[in-house]
Amino acid sequence: MVAKNVKTFALGVEYDGSYYHGWQRQKIVPSIQEEIEKALSIIANHKIDVVCAGRTDAGVHSIGQVIHFKTTANRKKSSWSIGVNSYLSENISVVWVKEVTENFHARYSAITRSYRYIIYNYSLRSAIFQTKLNHIYRKLNVDKMHFEAQFLLGEHDFTSFRALGCQSHSPWRNITKLNVFRFHNWVVVDITANSFLHHMVRNIVGSLIEVGISKKKEYWIKDLLEKKDRSHAGATAPAKGLYLVYVEYPLHFNLPRSAYTSIFFK
């Protein structure tokens, strides 16, 4: 796009990933990126390409996705939120919009990304949350899960928790927060890192579930991390329990937060 009169906008986006084959645009199946770009292009009256903070997989949800795009269109601020939402299905919504400096980049400007994984831990399944939570009927020992999770804090080689087809050049990531707690019949895993490998969060959760059902001995997560071998870890937890809840940026960008991020993610 020619630099003259180009504006850069950041948008906060939430979506129910149950209806899409992930974030990334694909040729045949529906994607969140495609739907958003279509809606933005209608408002701008020219083709819009967007960049996101984190490319979520099929079935993964978000209340904190951040995207940016560039445009030569001169529109009211509300056109990029209310206007765009009028062309989106009810399971995708723009929740805030802000004009940013041209050097802002949704992916590369991000400092950390935070995810929440929610498990419905009850003997009987839920009819309401089938596509929103992962149901585990066996009682989970949350204290054990949280204890083992602390071995993953800090900068490590997370080869044991990356997908076999992960294309990242380096397996090293820095986890700054990893908490496991129970709220009635819900078990929640909160995790924050500079960035994540493909399936990293779901592979960590899958391994912590094995700890929670007492299938593995104490310090297993520590040993697993040191092995650097995916084949020794637990199964990948289902996508439906995973939410991208917050992306942190330098304060000078002054980006808004989702209205209920502070409630949903502590």
UniProtKB/Swiss-Prot annotation:
PANTHER family referenced in this protein's UniProt entry, alphabetically: PSEUDOURIDYLATE SYNTHASE, TRNA PSEUDOURIDINE SYNTHASE-LIKE 1
EC number(s) from the headed UniProt entry: 5.4.99.12
Name of the protein described by the UniProt record: tRNA pseudouridine synthase A
CDD domains in UniProt: PseudoU_synth_EcTruA
Lineage of origin: Bacteria, Pseudomonadati, Pseudomonadota, Gammaproteobacteria, Enterobacterales
Domain of life, source organism: Bacteria
Reactions accelerated catalytically: uridine(38/39/40) in tRNA = pseudouridine(38/39/40) in tRNA
Keyword Flavoprotein attached: no
Swiss-Prot/TrEMBL GO biological process terms: tRNA pseudouridine synthesis
Subunit: Homodimer.
Keyword GTP-binding: no
Enzyme class: isomerase
Active site, UniProt feature: 57 (nucleophile)
Family: Belongs to the tRNA pseudouridine synthase TruA family.
Stored InterPro entries: PsdUridine_synth_cat_dom_sf (IPR020103), PsdUridine_synth_TruA (IPR001406), PsdUridine_synth_TruA_a/b_dom (IPR020097), PsdUridine_synth_TruA_C (IPR020095), TruA/RsuA/RluB/E/F_N (IPR020094)
HAMAP family: TruA
Keywords: Isomerase, tRNA processing
Binding site for substrate: 115
GO MF term set: RNA binding; tRNA pseudouridine(38-40) synthase activity
NCBIfam families assigned to the protein according to its UniProt record, in alphabetical order: hisT_truA
Gene name of this polypeptide: truA
Species annotation: Buchnera aphidicola subsp. Acyrthosiphon pisum (strain Tuc7)
